[in-house]
Amino acid sequence: MLNKELLDALNEQMNHEFYAAHAYMAMAAFCDDNSYEGFANFYIQQAKEERFHGKKIYDYINDRGEHALFTAIPAPKTEFSSILETFEDGLAQEQDVTHRFYNLSDLANKDKDYATISFLNWFLDEQVEEEAMFETHIDYLNRIGDDSNTLYLYEKELAARSFDESE
């Protein structure tokens, strides 16, 4: 059984993961609308990953004998000025998620809930990778600047990205 405060926070995070999936789909739509199919694919794969994270938390809540509670998902931002802005927003979103997992870890540590601490460590490791990935993309896009040929090649690279739940 989970402490109520921790359970509420896990439910909130589960819902936030599904919100993040919506936000990434909005970024994909912007990319598709502007004929950047490779970047759109990147965000579609990100959305799949966020849904996987939400489902992982859902499963954990149920495995602990608790009930997952779903809330309304707010509409994400849908207007962007550039591909770079989508990546900057993605990084900000991942940084927010990292802080949310830090707060969850603090609650689990306070309760000495070692099973939840172990569960959350996977997400903390994942967040290090996510933030680093977005930072790399932002750095690369800044270096590319207005070079449309290099942007085209970079987009083609991202078009091949796929999400694998086993990673």
UniProtKB/Swiss-Prot annotation:
Fe cation 1 binds at E17, E50, H53. One of its GO terms (cellular component) is cytosol. InterPro entries: Ferritin, Ferritin-like, Ferritin-like_diiron, Ferritin-like_SF, Ferritin_DPS_dom, Ferritin_prok. Residues 2-145 form the Ferritin-like diiron domain. GO terms for biological process: intracellular iron ion homeostasis; iron ion transport. The keyword Oxidoreductase applies. Keywords: Cytoplasm, Iron, Iron storage, Metal-binding, Oxidoreductase. The keyword Acyltransferase does not apply. It is an enzyme of class 1 (oxidoreductase). Belongs to the ferritin family. Prokaryotic subfamily. This is Bacterial non-heme ferritin. It comes from Staphylococcus saprophyticus subsp. saprophyticus (strain ATCC 15305 / DSM 20229 / NCIMB 8711 / NCTC 7292 / S-41).
